[in-house]
Amino acid sequence: MARITVEDCLKQIPNRFELALAATYRARQLAQGHTPKIESRDKPTVVALREIASGLVGVEMLKKVPV
């Protein structure tokens, strides 16, 4: 499997801080049992980054975070 890099993800979410927040929130969702949007056997963090790099998850993820 190809490696996922931050540069791949930055094409979808150009702000590094928003990228980190979106990836963290999505990884927590996956760890809690949410269905992944891609087929993968990787850890939740890697799956979250792959979803972001492929454009399936974006900055809109931050609007779902409970305050």
From Swiss-Prot:
SMART domains: RNA_pol_Rpb6. Its EC number is 2.7.7.6. One of its GO terms (molecular function) is DNA binding. Keywords: DNA-directed RNA polymerase, Nucleotidyltransferase, Transcription, Transferase. The keyword Nucleotidyltransferase applies. Gene3D superfamilies: 3.90.940.10. GO terms for biological process: DNA-templated transcription. GO terms for cellular component: DNA-directed RNA polymerase complex. It catalyses: RNA(n) + a ribonucleoside 5'-triphosphate = RNA(n+1) + diphosphate. InterPro entries: DNA-dir_RNA_pol_omega (IPR003716), Pol_omega/Rpo6/RPB6 (IPR006110), RPB6/omega-like_sf (IPR036161). The RNAP catalytic core consists of 2 alpha, 1 beta, 1 beta' and 1 omega subunit. When a sigma factor is associated with the core the holoenzyme is formed, which can initiate transcription. Promotes RNA polymerase assembly. Latches the N- and C-terminal regions of the beta' subunit thereby facilitating its interaction with the beta and alpha subunits. Belongs to the RNA polymerase subunit omega family. This is DNA-directed RNA polymerase subunit omega.
